[in-house]
Each structure stands twice: as structure tokens, then as C-alpha cells.
């Protein structure tokens, strides 16, 4: 695929990241080697690539199960037994089934665990990300952030970062806000031991999967009142600003509503007797 055709799949404001992504694809295709991105890409990128792109297999890894931000590996067919395609997750058994040597697929990332004493105040995602980005670290070089409380009443932030900046962060990050922090690199061999996302489940009933209908039901605002935040760019679908109130969403879509949080359309639960759609929505907490 030519570069200009590839870039047409993405909004103009994402052309820089899309251009970098194409370069990795080109390396894998031209030199028949596995090519890894250093950056973590959001779903609006890796969903478009699918399982195979331009004759090259696609594997994504964000360390955590169901992660949003993922590094991408472009894997030529020469590294695969048979004509198998790949899914988005790459656990050990999957790699064996597809004939891939685990040592050939070491994504260039490290998982950091950042711990602080939270007995005296509450610390949020924005506190951790603010301190990390205060080191002049770009957001796209970091994956998803998951917070967990430990038995000592400390709060721990787990975040995968590009391998090239991991030592720098370990050396330079001294505190989160005004709280002194401890930081370490975590072994990710056993993914069952890694922290998991926490959700609040909500069953919504909507006339259709139109954006304004779903946002209205999630926020308990009228459809008239949600038009303003949508048109003002306060609603994102798969991390992309979406101003089209009539856009039809799909199961698996991520919706971020400023002031209300992030949600995933998780499962289609069928229709009501009156023909309305029942959808299981998960809110990230």
C-alpha cells in the first residue's frame, strides 16, 4: 500500500503518528524483519490495521489485558507457521499456536510500578500522569495507567513505558505531586498477576446506537442538552474527537465524555419488546 493511501484512513491531525506507523510497516515489508513501534497507539489506529495489513501480520501489546494503548508489531509471514492470522492479544499459548518464538517477539516496553503513601490524601490518574509528563516524557511513549491500593494503604500506579525511556523515568521520578514515590520495574512474565481494569456495569436502553442517544442515556441528560458538548468537541470515540451526533457506534467502541468519564460499549443484549436496543456499558473506575 502506498503511503498516501494509508494516511487517508486517518484524520489530518493524526497524520504525524500515522506516518510514523507506516514507516514501521514499510521496514517489515521491505526487509522481512519484525518491526516494533516505540510509541503506544490508541484504538483508532490499531483497529484500522486489523489482523493483517498489506500482507504483514499485526500483533499488538499493551501489557495489560484489554489495554487501550498498545505497541504494534509488524510480523512478516516468514515468522509464522502456515497462513494463520493474529488477534490483538498475544498470550503465550497464542504465540506457540502460530509458530512464533517468544524471544523473537519481545515488545520494547517495561512495566513500571510507582508507589506512594495515600493515607493523607487521594491521588488520581491525573496526578501520576502529570508528574510523569513533567519529566518531558511524551504521552504516546506510555501505555495505560492502572491504579491499585496495596495492604499498606499505599496507592500503586502501574504503567508500561517505551523501553528507551524506562531507565530515565526510574532515575528521575522522585515524587507524585508533593508525595515522595518509590519506583521499580515489574516482571510481566505471568500476566495473570498483573493489575486489571475495574469497571462499573450499566445496562442502557436506547432507540439506536447513535452517539447522541448513547451519550444522553449514559449522562442522564436530554438529547437536546448533549448536542452542545458533542459539537464543542467534548466527546471522543476511540480517542478521536467526534462532533457528528448521528454517528452510529459499534460494540467495542470507547466513549470518553469530559466531566463524565470513559465508557466501553461492551455487549449487545438484544432488543426490548418495543424494539429498543439493550447494551451493556462498562464505565472505567
Positions of predicted regions on the chain:
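Ferredoxin-like alpha/beta domains used as RNA- or RNAP-binding modules
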Residues: 1-212, 218, 241, 248, ...
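Internal, well-folded beta-alpha domain core
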Residues: 215-216, 222, 234, 251
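Short, well-ordered loop/turn sites that connect or cap secondary structure elements
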Residues: 229-230, 249
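A generic structural motif
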Residues: 232, 260-262
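Short strand-turn-strand beta-turns centered on an Asx-Gly dipeptide
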Residues: 237-239, 258
Amino acid at each position: 500500500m502506498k503511503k498516501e493511501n494509508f494516511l487517508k484512513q486517518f484524520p489530518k491531525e493524526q497524520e504525524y503518528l500515522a506516518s510514523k506507523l507506516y514507516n514501521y510497516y514499510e521496514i517489515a515489508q521491505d526487509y522481512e524483519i519484525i518491526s516494533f513501534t516505540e510509541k503506544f497507539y490508541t484504538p483508532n489506529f490499531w483497529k484500522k490495521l486489523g489482523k493483517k495489513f498489506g500482507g504483514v501480520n499485526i500483533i499488538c501489546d499493551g501489557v495489560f489485558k484489554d489495554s487501550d494503548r498498545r505497541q504494534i508489531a509488524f510480523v512478516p509471514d516468514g515468522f509464522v507457521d502456515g497462513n494463520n492470522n493474529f488477534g490483538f492479544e498475544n498470550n503465550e499459548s497464542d504465540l506457540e499456536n502460530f509458530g512464533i518464538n517468544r524471544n523473537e517477539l519481545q515488545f520494547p516496553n517495561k512495566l513500571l510500578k510507582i508507589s506512594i503513601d495515600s493515607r493523607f490524601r487521594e491521588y488520581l490518574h491525573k496526578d501520576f500522569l502529570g508528574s510523569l509528563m513533567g519529566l518531558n516524557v511524551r504521552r504516546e511513549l506510555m501505555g495505560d495507567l492502572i491504579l491499585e491500593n496495596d495492604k499498606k494503604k499505599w496507592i500503586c500506579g502501574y504503567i508500561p513505558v517505551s523501553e528507551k525511556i524506562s531507565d530515565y523515568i526510574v532515575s528521575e521520578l522522585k515524587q507524585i505531586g508533593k508525595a515522595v514515590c518509590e519506583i521499580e520495574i515489574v516482571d510481566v512474565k505471568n500476566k495473570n498477576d498483573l493489575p486489571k481494569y475495574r469497571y462499573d456495569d450499566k445496562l442502557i436502553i436506547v432507540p439506536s446506537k447513535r452517539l447522541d442517544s448513547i451519550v444522553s442515556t449514559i449522562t442522564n441528560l436530554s438529547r437536546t442538552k448533549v448536542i452542545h458538548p458533542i459539537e464543542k468537541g467534548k466527546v471522543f470515540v476511540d480517542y478521536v474527537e467526534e462532533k457528528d451526533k448521528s454517528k452510529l457506534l459499534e460494540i467495542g467502541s470507547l466513549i470518553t465524555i469530559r466531566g463524565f468519564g470513559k465508557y466501553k460499549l461492551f455487549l449487545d443484549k438484544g432488543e426490548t419488546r418495543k424494539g429498543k436496543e439493550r447494551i451493556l456499558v462498562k464505565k472505567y473506575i
